[in-house]
Structures are given as structure tokens and as C-alpha cells.
């Protein structure tokens, strides 16, 4: 798999080849990247304002900065914000970590004047060009994502709509201007091979607004036609409704060189969570892209994303950077006193113009990459590289047990392994739907005598320690192999429950270990490539709170 995600595979125009994406050399390529959420389309929760805050979209943020600091300050604030949020240092860091692509969510108001007449914004395209140039210099493909269409496409705050109405599908002017924007993007970037593809609409039509699904299908037809009149080479990415989790719009293949994109949050990290999309991929003979995902514990990241890649599905992690965030790859610290701004957004006292400017200046300074908190455990988990803790139930796709029986959690029931609750864990207090959201890691793998199971990780430096977390009641012996080579053995005494260093691993770009139970049975809780331990971020619900 390593060669499919390596940055050395970033070469030439990407294209669709059946259910695969291939690069300019005809080699299979799996996008593995991050998204610049909050850069060109701000969201309140990414400023640590909390869910449900009135100030939750760019047009309201613009009003907020004016209210706090005055028009003169506000006029200069947004250029500084965009100059600082994504810099060349960010791009270099993303490439150095080993990602191969970025997704740029775009608000139409960055590139197109919010006026009845069609008028493009030169400075917006210059900013986009600058980022694309940096990506090309550093070997990162760029997915252009229309996150906020003219008038809004979602029916929520995330598209910078005025009032949570998807006017793209109601007002003809919004519809035509959005098509013209895509024509302009195609004209500008048709010859840029580093542009991976065009993500036509982010998460269209949620909730009651799905009644416009037929109009969404028409828009996709019209938009593909408009782009193909100008650009016949770039891939086109198509998303479904309901946060890109509903496949109802996929009644046909919209373009031969298109990719089906879905988004995944709060799902079980198991094949069952991907099955609907894999069936769709097979039906239309098109590749899949997990175009947005995140918000969980590192163990969930490494379980879900490696599974996606092993199923032939590219992954994009949301977001790269966010304010005061526990489990982001990169977190800009909230300034001391930031709660004064947050309190004002919730109806509290105005901090005063001078104090507000002071806080916002520090906010801008903190978002420079060199001032951000880098969370190596999150990055390691997303990339499944040392140091990383892999839950026992996150075994490789294709590993097959002998003695398993279906479990009541519908978790990897086709694997042939027995999966059960860890000792001392009780999930009866959870509503049935929440097992996938907050407590899937209460499950563990039972490895019985005569069974083996495989785990893969990337970028293993020489001498990386291997730790096994397991317990047994009657005692067990475990052999660990790399290929046919026996690396080490582990003996567990009766009633043993331990985390043991087993051996040191050889250097490898990609390393697959096979663990074989040669005597007895054991509960295999985790395999640790390096000295990573269980994350202490708490439950999913706790993770949702900012620092």
C-alpha cells in the first residue's frame, strides 16, 4: 500500500481507471491528505466558539469583527487572517509528515463578488494560485472544493448562506453564477496537473432540503457539462446529500472521469460502515474518496483510515488546523482572555475596541504554523506510522479467523474472529446507536489457538519497539512474524493482563506483522508500533469540547 500513498506517486494528471485513481504514470494512487477548513470559509466551532453560536459563518464573522474593532481594523483583518492561516510553512510540514494531497474548501465570496452582476475577485484567485504553487513545489495534489456555492447549497451554516436556505437550488441567478464560477476555475486550472480534481459541491442538501435532490442531480449534469466544455482532463468529485452520507443522488454515472465522495464521522471503524459505498463503486465502476472525516480519538483515526485505504479508498482528514482543539493535527492556541470574545458572541459584555484588537492580533499571531501546537499522536494515527497504538480489533482487511461467530454489535462480523467486550466494560447504559460513536473501543479481539491476525503500519524506523497489550485466563503463547521470519514470541501466564515489550522492529516503509496464537487463547487489546499508549482524550462527547 505504501507505494500508492507515497508522495513519490505524485506525478502527472490524476485520472479514473475503473474503480481506481491512477497518476500520470498509470500507477494506482490513493489520496491521503488534509483539508484547510476554516481558511476560506470560517466556522464558529473552529474558532472555539462552541456549537450553536450565532457567529458560525463568514458573513457573521465579518460583522463580528466590525462590531468589536471598527471598520478600519476589520478591513485589514481578513487579509492577515488568510495570510497567516495557510503559509508555505504549513505546506512544507504537511508534505514532510508524508501526506500526499490537500483539499481546499472555497467560499464563492472569496472568488466572486456578492453582487447581482458576475464579477470575479482577482485577489482571491491570487491567494488560491499561491497555495497551489506551494503545493506543486512540495509534491502535494490539490482538490478544489466548492464549500460555499453562490446562495448556499446545504441548508445549514457551513456554506455561508444568509438564512440556512439552499438558494443554489431555488434562485436561478445563484445557479447560473455557480456554473460560471466552475467554468472560470476550469479555465484557470485546466493545464495544472497538480490540481487533482474538482469537488463540485460540499455536503449538499441536509434534512428537509433533500426535497431538492432532483435539482441537485440536474446541477451535477449542468456543472459537468460546463466544465467539460473547457477541461476534459481533471477528475470531477461528486458528493451525496445529508453531509455526503446519503447516496440517493447516485442514480447514474455523472461522468466517466468522476469519483464518488462520501464523508464519515461517528461511524464504527469496520467494513460494514463502508459497504453501501463499496456497492455503489462496484455498480458504477468508479473509485471512492473519503473526502472528509475526523473528530474522534486517535485510535478511531488509525482504525478507520487504514481500513479505508486497504479497501482502496482515499482519505482526507478534517481539518488541518483549528483553534484550541484537542485532536487536530495542528491547533492554534486561543489567546489568554479569548473567553472575553466568546462571551460577547453569547450576549456578554463588549470587551472594548482596544482589548478586542489586542486579542485578535494575538489570535492571528498564534495561527502561524510555528506558533501552533502539533499533535504527533494524531498525525501518527491518521498516517498509521510509528509511534502508533493500533486497537486489536483494527486488524488488516483480509485477515481471517477460524472460530468467530457474529457479535451483537455488527462489528466485522464477516472476519471470522470472535469479538467481545473487554472485561469490566458494560454498554447497557448506551442507546444502541451510540455504540459506534463513543464506545466501540470497549470491544476486543479474541485470538484462539491456531488463529493468526495481521497488522500493518508505515514508516518504521530501525529499532522501533513493539508492545503487545493482551490478557488471558488460562495462559497463552504468541508468535510474531514479519513475512515468514519469526521476530519474537510472547508467553502469557494464567490470569495475565499486561502491556509487554516484545521486540524491536526492523526499518520499513511498510511493515505487516502476523500474530499467531500457538497455545491457548487471549484477548488482544492493542498492538503498539513504538511506545504509544492509549490516548487520554476521553469519550467522543468529551472530545467535542474545545480545550
Model regions: which residues?
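Extended, alpha-helix-rich binding/interface surfaces that flank or overlap catalytic cores
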Residues: 314, 321-389
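Alpha-helix-centered segments that form part of catalytic cores
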Residues: 67-96, 361-381, 436-449
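An active-site-proximal structural segment forming one wall of the substrate-binding cleft
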Residues: 75-102, 117-148, 156-197, 226
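Extracellular glycoside hydrolase catalytic/binding regions
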Residues: 7-14, 173-323, 331-340
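N-terminal carbohydrate-binding accessory modules
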Residues: 1-99
Amino acid at each position: 500500500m505504501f507505494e500508492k500513498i507515497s508522495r513519490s506517486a505524485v506525478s502527472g494528471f490524476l485520472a479514473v481507471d475503473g474503480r481506481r485513481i491512477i497518476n500520470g504514470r498509470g500507477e494506482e494512487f490513493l489520496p491521503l491528505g488534509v483539508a484547510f477548513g476554516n481558511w476560506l470559509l470560517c466556522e464558529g466551532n473552529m474558532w472555539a466558539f462552541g456549537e450553536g453560536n450565532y457567529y458560525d459563518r463568514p458573513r457573521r464573522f465579518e460583522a463580528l469583527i466590525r462590531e468589536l474593532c471598527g471598520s478600519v481594523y476589520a478591513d485589514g483583518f481578513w487579509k492577515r487572517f488568510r495570510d497567516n492561516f495557510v503559509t508555505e510553512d504549513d505546506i512544507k510540514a504537511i508534505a514532510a509528515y508524508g501526506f500526499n494531497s490537500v483539499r481546499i474548501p472555497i467560499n464563492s465570496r472569496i472568488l466572486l463578488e456578492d453582487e447581482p452582476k458576475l464579477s470575479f475577485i482577482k485577489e482571491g484567485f491570487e491567494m488560491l494560485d499561491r497555495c497551489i504553487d506551494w503545493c506543486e513545489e512540495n509534491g502535494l495534489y490539490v482538490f478544489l472544493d466548492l464549500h460555499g456555492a453562490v446562495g448556499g447549497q446545504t441548508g445549514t451554516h457551513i456554506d455561508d448562506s444568509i438564512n440556512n436556505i439552499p438558494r443554489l437550488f431555488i434562485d436561478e441567478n445563484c445557479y447560473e453564477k455557480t456554473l460560471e464560477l466552475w467554468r472560470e476555475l476550469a479555465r484557470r486550472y485546466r493545464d495544472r496537473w497538480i490540481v487533482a480534481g474538482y469537488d463540485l459541491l460540499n455536503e449538499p442538501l441536509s434534512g428537509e432540503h433533500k426535497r431538492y435532490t432532483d435539482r441537485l442531480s440536474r446541477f451535477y449534469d449542468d456543472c459537468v457539462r460546463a466544465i467539460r466544455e473547457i477541461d476534459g482532463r481533471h477528475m470531477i468529485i461528486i458528493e451525496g446529500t445529508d453531509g455526503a452520507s446519503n447516496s440517493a443522488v447516485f442514480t447514474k454515472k455523472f461522468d466517466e472521469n468522476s469519483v464518488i465522495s462520501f464523508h464519515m464521522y461517528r461511524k464504527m471503524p469496520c467494513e460494514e460502515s463502508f459497504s453501501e459505498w463499496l456497492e455503489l463503486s462496484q455498480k458504477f465502476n468508479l473509485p471512492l474518496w473519503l473526502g472528509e472525516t475526523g473528530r474522534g480519538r486517535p485510535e478511531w483515526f488509525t482504525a478507520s483510515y487504514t481500513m479505508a485505504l486497504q479497501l482502496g479508498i482515499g482519505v482526507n482528514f478534517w481539518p488541518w488546523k483549528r483553534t484550541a482543539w484537542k485532536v487536530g493535527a495542528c491547533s492554534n492556541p486561543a489567546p489568554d482572555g479569548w473567553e472575553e470574545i466568546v462571551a460577547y458572541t453569547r450576549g456578554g459584555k463588549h470587551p472594548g475596541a482596544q482589548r478586542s484588537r489586542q486579542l485578535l492580533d494575538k489570535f492571528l499571531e498564534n495561527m502561524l504554523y510555528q506558533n501552533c501546537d502539533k499533535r504527533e499522536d494524531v498525525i501518527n494515527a491518521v498516517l498509521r506510522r510509528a509511534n502508533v497504538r493500533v486497537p486489536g480489533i483494527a486488524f488488516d482487511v483480509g485477515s481471517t479467523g477460524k472460530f468467530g461467530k457474529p457479535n451483537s454489535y455488527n462489528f466485522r462480523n464477516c472476519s471470522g474472529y470472535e469479538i467481545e467486550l473487554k472485561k469490566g466494560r458494560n454498554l447497557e447504559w448506551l442507546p444502541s446507536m451510540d455504540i459506534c460513536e463513543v464506545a466501540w473501543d470497549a470491544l476486543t479481539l479474541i485470538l484462539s489457538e491456531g488463529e493468526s491476525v495481521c497488522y500493518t503500519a508505515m514508516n518504521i524506523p530501525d529499532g522501533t519497539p513493539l508492545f503487545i497489550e493482551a490478557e488471558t485466563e488460562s495462559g497463552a503463547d504468541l508468535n510474531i512474524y514479519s513475512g515468514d521470519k519469526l521476530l519474537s514470541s510472547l508467553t502469557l501466564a494464567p490470569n495475565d493482563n499486561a502491556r509487554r515489550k516484545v521486540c524491536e522492529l526492523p526499518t520499513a516503509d511498510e511493515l505487516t506483522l502476523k500474530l499467531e496464537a500457538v497455545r491457548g487463547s487471549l484477548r488482544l487489546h492493542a498492538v503498539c508500533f513504538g511506545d504509544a499508549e492509549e490516548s487520554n482524550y476521553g469519550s467522543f462527547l468529551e472530545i467535542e469540547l474545545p480545550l
